[in-house]
Protein backbone atom coordinates (compact mmCIF):
# COMPACT_ATOMS: atom_id res chain seq x y z
CA UNK A 1 0.00 0.00 0.00
CA UNK A 2 1.37 3.38 -1.03
CA UNK A 3 1.06 6.58 0.98
CA UNK A 4 0.80 10.11 -0.35
CA UNK A 5 3.72 12.44 0.25
CA UNK A 6 1.86 14.45 2.89
CA UNK A 7 0.95 11.26 4.76
CA UNK A 8 4.54 10.04 4.62
CA UNK A 9 5.78 13.36 5.99
CA UNK A 10 3.33 13.16 8.87
CA UNK A 11 4.98 9.85 9.75
CA UNK A 12 8.39 11.46 9.35
CA UNK A 13 7.41 14.17 11.83
CA UNK A 14 6.18 11.55 14.29
CA UNK A 15 9.64 9.95 14.18
CA UNK A 16 11.41 13.27 14.67
CA UNK A 17 12.69 13.57 11.11
CA UNK A 18 13.29 17.06 9.68
CA UNK A 19 10.65 18.15 7.14
CA UNK A 20 9.39 21.54 6.04
CA UNK A 21 6.01 22.73 7.30
CA UNK A 22 3.21 21.85 4.93
CA UNK A 23 -0.55 21.53 4.65
CA UNK A 24 -2.93 19.86 2.24
CA UNK A 25 -6.07 21.18 0.54
CA UNK A 26 -8.86 19.32 -1.26
CA UNK A 27 -10.60 22.31 -2.87
CA UNK A 28 -9.66 25.70 -4.28
CA UNK A 29 -11.60 27.37 -1.47
CA UNK A 30 -9.19 25.87 1.07
CA UNK A 31 -6.04 27.32 -0.52
CA UNK A 32 -6.09 30.64 1.37
CA UNK A 33 -6.69 28.89 4.69
CA UNK A 34 -3.91 26.39 4.05
CA UNK A 35 -1.35 29.02 3.06
CA UNK A 36 -2.24 31.09 6.13
CA UNK A 37 -0.82 28.22 8.22
CA UNK A 38 2.55 28.45 6.45
CA UNK A 39 5.31 31.03 6.60
CA UNK A 40 7.15 32.62 3.70
CA UNK A 41 6.00 34.35 0.54
CA UNK A 42 6.38 31.42 -1.86
CA UNK A 43 5.59 27.72 -1.56
CA UNK A 44 6.02 24.39 -3.32
CA UNK A 45 2.69 23.13 -4.68
CA UNK A 46 2.57 19.36 -5.23
CA UNK A 47 -0.15 17.17 -6.73
CA UNK A 48 -0.74 14.16 -4.48
CA UNK A 49 -0.75 10.98 -6.55
CA UNK A 50 0.75 7.51 -6.09
CA UNK A 51 3.33 7.94 -8.84
CA UNK A 52 6.76 9.39 -9.40
CA UNK A 53 7.73 11.83 -12.11
CA UNK A 54 5.29 14.50 -10.93
CA UNK A 55 7.68 17.37 -11.53
CA UNK A 56 8.38 16.52 -15.17
CA UNK A 57 4.62 16.16 -15.76
CA UNK A 58 3.84 19.60 -14.33
CA UNK A 59 2.45 18.28 -11.07
CA UNK A 60 4.95 20.19 -8.91
CA UNK A 61 5.41 23.95 -9.10
CA UNK A 62 6.96 26.76 -7.10
CA UNK A 63 4.14 29.29 -6.60
CA UNK A 64 5.05 32.90 -5.85
CA UNK A 65 1.80 34.13 -4.30
CA UNK A 66 -1.71 33.12 -3.23
CA UNK A 67 -3.20 33.80 -6.67
CA UNK A 68 -0.69 31.52 -8.37
CA UNK A 69 -1.39 28.86 -5.73
CA UNK A 70 -5.13 29.10 -6.39
CA UNK A 71 -4.51 28.90 -10.13
CA UNK A 72 -2.43 25.73 -9.66
CA UNK A 73 -5.19 24.15 -7.54
CA UNK A 74 -7.86 25.10 -10.10
CA UNK A 75 -5.80 23.52 -12.86
CA UNK A 76 -5.19 20.18 -11.15
CA UNK A 77 -7.86 19.35 -8.56
CA UNK A 78 -10.28 16.86 -10.08
CA UNK A 79 -7.98 16.19 -13.03
CA UNK A 80 -5.67 13.25 -13.75
CA UNK A 81 -1.89 13.49 -13.74
CA UNK A 82 -0.07 11.38 -16.32
CA UNK A 83 3.59 10.58 -15.58
CA UNK A 84 6.08 8.03 -16.87
CA UNK A 85 5.03 5.78 -13.96
CA UNK A 86 1.27 5.83 -14.68
CA UNK A 87 -0.77 4.38 -17.50
CA UNK A 88 -2.14 6.62 -20.23
CA UNK A 89 -5.13 7.55 -18.05
CA UNK A 90 -2.97 8.82 -15.21
CA UNK A 91 -3.90 9.15 -11.52
CA UNK A 92 -6.65 11.37 -10.08
CA UNK A 93 -5.52 14.49 -8.22
CA UNK A 94 -7.73 14.92 -5.15
CA UNK A 95 -5.32 16.87 -2.93
CA UNK A 96 -2.66 19.54 -3.37
CA UNK A 97 0.14 19.69 -0.80
CA UNK A 98 1.60 23.14 -0.14
CA UNK A 99 4.97 23.27 1.58
CA UNK A 100 7.36 25.95 2.77
CA UNK A 101 10.48 26.32 0.65
CA UNK A 102 14.15 26.32 1.59
CA UNK A 103 17.44 27.47 0.07
CA UNK A 104 19.17 24.34 -1.22
CA UNK A 105 22.93 23.92 -1.20
CA UNK A 106 23.22 20.20 -2.05
CA UNK A 107 20.85 17.33 -2.87
CA UNK A 108 21.26 13.70 -1.78
CA UNK A 109 19.34 10.47 -2.32
CA UNK A 110 18.39 8.09 0.50
CA UNK A 111 16.16 5.01 0.43
CA UNK A 112 15.53 1.66 2.08
CA UNK A 113 14.18 -1.57 0.62
CA UNK A 114 13.86 -5.20 1.67
CA UNK A 115 16.57 -7.40 0.17
CA UNK A 116 15.14 -10.90 0.15
CA UNK A 117 18.45 -12.46 -0.86
CA UNK A 118 20.22 -11.29 2.29
CA UNK A 119 17.00 -11.20 4.37
CA UNK A 120 17.93 -7.71 5.49
CA UNK A 121 16.90 -4.12 4.91
CA UNK A 122 19.26 -2.30 2.57
CA UNK A 123 19.77 1.45 2.86
CA UNK A 124 20.97 3.13 -0.33
CA UNK A 125 22.50 6.60 -0.34
CA UNK A 126 23.90 8.73 -3.13
CA UNK A 127 25.28 12.26 -3.55
CA UNK A 128 23.29 12.39 -6.81
CA UNK A 129 19.96 13.39 -5.32
CA UNK A 130 16.93 14.82 -7.09
CA UNK A 131 17.57 12.59 -10.12
CA UNK A 132 16.06 9.36 -11.42
CA UNK A 133 17.92 6.80 -9.34
CA UNK A 134 17.65 4.29 -12.20
CA UNK A 135 19.80 6.59 -14.34
CA UNK A 136 22.34 6.94 -11.53
CA UNK A 137 22.51 3.15 -11.10
CA UNK A 138 23.03 2.65 -14.83
CA UNK A 139 25.41 5.47 -15.64
CA UNK A 140 27.30 6.13 -12.38
CA UNK A 141 26.90 3.07 -10.13
CA UNK A 142 29.94 4.11 -8.09
CA UNK A 143 27.80 6.93 -6.66
CA UNK A 144 25.51 4.42 -4.90
CA UNK A 145 26.50 3.46 -1.35
CA UNK A 146 24.76 0.70 0.62
CA UNK A 147 24.55 -0.67 4.15
CA UNK A 148 22.57 -3.70 5.32
CA UNK A 149 20.33 -3.50 8.38
CA UNK A 150 19.61 -6.62 10.39
CA UNK A 151 15.88 -6.41 11.23
CA UNK A 152 16.56 -7.98 14.63
CA UNK A 153 18.81 -5.11 15.69
CA UNK A 154 17.80 -2.21 13.46
CA UNK A 155 20.09 0.49 12.18
CA UNK A 156 23.23 1.18 14.18
CA UNK A 157 24.81 4.64 14.56
CA UNK A 158 28.13 3.60 13.03
CA UNK A 159 26.28 2.58 9.84
CA UNK A 160 24.74 6.02 9.58
CA UNK A 161 28.12 7.66 10.10
CA UNK A 162 29.64 5.37 7.46
CA UNK A 163 27.06 6.47 4.87
CA UNK A 164 27.46 10.11 5.87
CA UNK A 165 31.23 9.97 5.32
CA UNK A 166 30.69 8.43 1.87
CA UNK A 167 28.37 11.32 1.03
CA UNK A 168 31.05 13.79 2.05
CA UNK A 169 29.26 14.92 5.21
CA UNK A 170 31.23 15.75 8.33
CA UNK A 171 30.81 17.48 11.64
CA UNK A 172 27.27 18.67 12.37
CA UNK A 173 25.89 17.36 9.08
CA UNK A 174 27.32 13.90 9.81
CA UNK A 175 25.44 13.82 13.12
CA UNK A 176 22.26 15.11 11.49
CA UNK A 177 22.46 12.44 8.80
CA UNK A 178 23.05 9.72 11.39
CA UNK A 179 19.98 10.86 13.34
CA UNK A 180 17.91 10.78 10.13
CA UNK A 181 19.27 7.33 9.29
CA UNK A 182 18.37 6.00 12.74
CA UNK A 183 14.87 7.50 12.57
CA UNK A 184 14.19 6.08 9.12
CA UNK A 185 15.46 2.68 10.26
CA UNK A 186 13.03 2.65 13.19
CA UNK A 187 10.19 3.81 10.95
CA UNK A 188 10.91 1.14 8.33
CA UNK A 189 10.98 -1.73 10.81
CA UNK A 190 8.23 -0.63 13.20
CA UNK A 191 5.74 0.11 10.42
CA UNK A 192 6.58 -2.93 8.25
CA UNK A 193 7.50 -0.89 5.20
CA UNK A 194 8.54 -2.41 1.88
CA UNK A 195 9.93 0.84 0.45
CA UNK A 196 11.07 4.15 1.87
CA UNK A 197 12.57 6.90 -0.27
CA UNK A 198 13.76 10.45 0.35
CA UNK A 199 14.63 12.10 -2.96
CA UNK A 200 15.95 14.62 -2.44
CA UNK A 201 17.38 14.81 1.04
CA UNK A 202 18.75 18.36 0.93
CA UNK A 203 21.44 20.30 2.72
CA UNK A 204 20.20 23.87 3.09
CA UNK A 205 22.39 26.93 2.84
CA UNK A 206 21.96 27.24 6.61
CA UNK A 207 23.71 23.88 7.02
CA UNK A 208 20.67 21.73 7.93
CA UNK A 209 19.54 18.46 6.38
CA UNK A 210 15.85 18.34 5.39
CA UNK A 211 13.71 15.54 3.91
CA UNK A 212 12.29 17.47 0.97
CA UNK A 213 10.34 14.56 -0.50
CA UNK A 214 8.99 11.35 0.99
CA UNK A 215 7.77 8.11 -0.52
CA UNK A 216 6.49 5.19 1.55
CA UNK A 217 5.08 1.78 0.62
CA UNK A 218 3.70 -0.46 3.37
CA UNK A 219 3.74 -4.26 3.15
CA UNK A 220 0.10 -5.20 2.43
CA UNK A 221 0.52 -8.44 4.39
CA UNK A 222 1.27 -6.44 7.55
CA UNK A 223 -1.64 -4.01 7.39
CA UNK A 224 -3.68 -6.10 9.83
CA UNK A 225 -1.41 -4.89 12.63
CA UNK A 226 -1.26 -1.28 11.45
CA UNK A 227 -4.85 -0.07 11.51
CA UNK A 228 -3.64 3.53 11.59
CA UNK A 229 -1.83 3.08 8.28
CA UNK A 230 -4.62 1.04 6.73
CA UNK A 231 -6.97 3.96 7.37
CA UNK A 232 -4.74 6.15 5.19
CA UNK A 233 -5.33 4.07 2.07
CA UNK A 234 -6.56 6.13 -0.89
CA UNK A 235 -8.59 3.73 -3.02
CA UNK A 236 -9.08 6.34 -5.73
CA UNK A 237 -5.44 5.81 -6.69
CA UNK A 238 -5.98 2.10 -7.35
CA UNK A 239 -6.98 0.64 -10.67
CA UNK A 240 -10.71 -0.18 -10.41
CA UNK A 241 -10.11 -3.76 -11.54
CA UNK A 242 -7.31 -4.24 -9.02
CA UNK A 243 -9.54 -2.93 -6.24
CA UNK A 244 -12.34 -5.31 -7.26
CA UNK A 245 -9.90 -8.23 -7.39
CA UNK A 246 -8.79 -7.56 -3.80
CA UNK A 247 -12.35 -8.19 -2.59
CA UNK A 248 -12.10 -11.78 -3.83
CA UNK A 249 -8.48 -12.32 -2.78
CA UNK A 250 -7.32 -12.27 -6.39
CA UNK A 251 -3.95 -10.74 -7.25
CA UNK A 252 -4.56 -8.64 -10.36
CA UNK A 253 -2.32 -6.13 -12.09
CA UNK A 254 -3.53 -4.40 -15.26
CA UNK A 255 -1.17 -4.30 -18.24
CA UNK A 256 -1.54 -2.93 -21.76
CA UNK A 257 -1.85 -6.05 -23.94
CA UNK A 258 -4.79 -7.97 -25.41
CA UNK A 259 -4.33 -11.50 -23.99
CA UNK A 260 -6.03 -11.93 -20.63
CA UNK A 261 -4.19 -14.35 -18.33
CA UNK A 262 -5.72 -16.38 -15.48
CA UNK A 263 -3.20 -18.51 -13.60
CA UNK A 264 -2.83 -20.11 -10.16
CA UNK A 265 0.46 -19.15 -8.54
CA UNK A 266 2.47 -15.97 -8.94
CA UNK A 267 5.53 -17.70 -10.38
CA UNK A 268 3.48 -19.61 -12.95
CA UNK A 269 1.64 -16.40 -13.80
CA UNK A 270 4.90 -14.59 -14.49
CA UNK A 271 6.15 -17.53 -16.56
CA UNK A 272 2.90 -17.53 -18.52
CA UNK A 273 3.28 -13.85 -19.36
CA UNK A 274 6.89 -14.45 -20.41
CA UNK A 275 6.00 -17.21 -22.85
CA UNK A 276 3.07 -15.21 -24.26
CA UNK A 277 5.56 -12.44 -24.96
CA UNK A 278 8.01 -14.96 -26.43
CA UNK A 279 5.38 -16.08 -28.96
CA UNK A 280 4.71 -12.50 -30.01
CA UNK A 281 1.72 -11.70 -27.81
CA UNK A 282 1.07 -9.02 -25.23
CA UNK A 283 -0.43 -9.93 -21.82
CA UNK A 284 -3.36 -7.76 -20.77
CA UNK A 285 -2.88 -8.51 -17.10
CA UNK A 286 -1.25 -10.48 -14.33
CA UNK A 287 -3.90 -12.47 -12.45
CA UNK A 288 -3.16 -15.05 -9.77
CA UNK A 289 -6.28 -16.87 -8.55
CA UNK A 290 -4.24 -18.56 -5.82
CA UNK A 291 -4.24 -22.14 -4.63
CA UNK A 292 -7.97 -22.29 -3.91
CA UNK A 293 -9.18 -21.72 -7.46
CA UNK A 294 -12.89 -22.35 -6.82
CA UNK A 295 -15.68 -21.94 -9.35
CA UNK A 296 -16.70 -18.66 -7.72
CA UNK A 297 -13.20 -17.18 -7.84
CA UNK A 298 -12.72 -18.32 -11.44
CA UNK A 299 -16.01 -16.64 -12.37
CA UNK A 300 -14.96 -13.40 -10.69
CA UNK A 301 -11.58 -13.61 -12.41
CA UNK A 302 -13.31 -13.88 -15.80
CA UNK A 303 -15.49 -10.87 -14.97
CA UNK A 304 -12.51 -8.75 -13.95
CA UNK A 305 -10.46 -9.69 -17.02
CA UNK A 306 -13.39 -8.91 -19.33
CA UNK A 307 -13.84 -5.41 -17.93
CA UNK A 308 -10.77 -4.59 -20.00
CA UNK A 309 -12.10 -3.82 -23.50
CA UNK A 310 -8.68 -4.57 -25.00
CA UNK A 311 -8.90 -8.29 -24.17
CA UNK A 312 -9.32 -10.43 -27.32
CA UNK A 313 -8.65 -13.85 -25.79
CA UNK A 314 -8.30 -15.37 -22.32
CA UNK A 315 -5.55 -17.85 -21.49
CA UNK A 316 -6.25 -20.05 -18.46
CA UNK A 317 -3.16 -21.87 -17.18
CA UNK A 318 -3.76 -24.05 -14.11
CA UNK A 319 -1.43 -26.46 -12.35
CA UNK A 320 -3.47 -28.85 -10.22
CA UNK A 321 -1.48 -29.28 -7.06
CA UNK A 322 -3.72 -28.15 -4.24
CA UNK A 323 -6.80 -28.28 -6.49
CA UNK A 324 -7.88 -31.02 -8.90
CA UNK A 325 -7.94 -30.23 -12.60
CA UNK A 326 -11.32 -31.90 -13.12
CA UNK A 327 -12.88 -29.50 -10.61
CA UNK A 328 -11.13 -26.58 -12.30
CA UNK A 329 -12.46 -27.70 -15.69
CA UNK A 330 -16.00 -27.81 -14.32
CA UNK A 331 -15.46 -24.40 -12.75
CA UNK A 332 -14.18 -22.91 -16.02
CA UNK A 333 -17.17 -24.25 -17.97
CA UNK A 334 -19.63 -22.97 -15.37
CA UNK A 335 -17.89 -19.60 -15.20
CA UNK A 336 -17.83 -19.18 -18.99
CA UNK A 337 -21.56 -19.91 -19.14
CA UNK A 338 -22.36 -17.70 -16.14
CA UNK A 339 -20.33 -14.72 -17.28
CA UNK A 340 -21.21 -15.06 -20.94
CA UNK A 341 -17.67 -14.96 -22.28
CA UNK A 342 -17.66 -13.82 -25.92
CA UNK A 343 -13.93 -14.05 -26.61
CA UNK A 344 -11.92 -17.24 -27.29
CA UNK A 345 -10.78 -19.11 -24.18
CA UNK A 346 -7.60 -21.21 -24.19
CA UNK A 347 -7.17 -23.63 -21.29
CA UNK A 348 -4.06 -25.54 -20.30
CA UNK A 349 -4.39 -27.97 -17.38
CA UNK A 350 -1.54 -29.90 -15.78
CA UNK A 351 -1.26 -31.88 -12.57
CA UNK A 352 -3.79 -33.87 -10.57
CA UNK A 353 -6.55 -35.31 -12.80
CA UNK A 354 -5.36 -33.19 -15.74
CA UNK A 355 -6.43 -35.78 -18.32
CA UNK A 356 -9.91 -35.99 -16.79
CA UNK A 357 -10.11 -32.22 -16.80
CA UNK A 358 -9.17 -32.01 -20.47
CA UNK A 359 -11.78 -34.65 -21.28
CA UNK A 360 -14.46 -32.67 -19.44
CA UNK A 361 -13.55 -29.58 -21.46
CA UNK A 362 -13.58 -31.53 -24.74
CA UNK A 363 -17.03 -33.00 -24.05
CA UNK A 364 -18.59 -29.71 -23.02
CA UNK A 365 -20.68 -27.56 -25.36
CA UNK A 366 -18.56 -24.52 -24.53
CA UNK A 367 -16.17 -23.17 -27.17
CA UNK A 368 -12.86 -23.72 -25.37
CA UNK A 369 -9.49 -24.37 -26.99
CA UNK A 370 -7.60 -27.03 -25.01
CA UNK A 371 -3.80 -27.06 -24.92
CA UNK A 372 -1.53 -29.91 -23.81
CA UNK A 373 1.51 -27.75 -23.10
CA UNK A 374 2.25 -24.20 -22.09
CA UNK A 375 3.94 -23.57 -25.43
CA UNK A 376 0.85 -24.75 -27.31
CA UNK A 377 -1.39 -22.67 -25.05
CA UNK A 378 0.66 -19.53 -25.71
CA UNK A 379 0.66 -20.17 -29.46
CA UNK A 380 -3.11 -20.72 -29.52
CA UNK A 381 -3.72 -17.58 -27.47
CA UNK A 382 -1.47 -15.41 -29.65
CA UNK A 383 -3.09 -16.72 -32.84
CA UNK A 384 -6.56 -16.18 -31.38
CA UNK A 385 -5.67 -12.60 -30.50
CA UNK A 386 -4.70 -12.12 -34.16
CA UNK A 387 -8.03 -13.62 -35.27
CA UNK A 388 -6.43 -16.82 -36.56
CA UNK A 389 -8.14 -19.37 -34.30
Curated annotation (Swiss-Prot):
Its cofactor is Mg(2+). It comes from the Bacteria. Pathway: Carbohydrate metabolism; tricarboxylic acid cycle; succinate from succinyl-CoA (ligase route): step 1/1. Mg(2+) binds at residues 199, 213. GO terms for cellular component: cytosol; succinate-CoA ligase complex. It catalyses: succinate + ATP + CoA = succinyl-CoA + ADP + phosphate; GTP + succinate + CoA = succinyl-CoA + GDP + phosphate. Its EC number is 6.2.1.5. PROSITE patterns: SUCCINYL_COA_LIG_3. ATP binds at residues 46, 53-55, 99, 102, 107. Heterotetramer of two alpha and two beta subunits. Succinyl-CoA synthetase functions in the citric acid cycle (TCA), coupling the hydrolysis of succinyl-CoA to the synthesis of either ATP or GTP and thus represents the only step of substrate-level phosphorylation in the TCA. The beta subunit provides nucleotide specificity of the enzyme and binds the substrate succinate, while the binding sites for coenzyme A and phosphate are found in the alpha subunit. PANTHER family: SUCCINATE--COA LIGASE [GDP-FORMING] SUBUNIT BETA, MITOCHONDRIAL, SUCCINYL-COA SYNTHETASE BETA CHAIN. Belongs to the succinate/malate CoA ligase beta subunit family. This is Succinate--CoA ligase [ADP-forming] subunit beta. It comes from Haemophilus influenzae (strain PittEE). The lineage of its organism: Bacteria, Pseudomonadati, Pseudomonadota, Gammaproteobacteria, Pasteurellales.
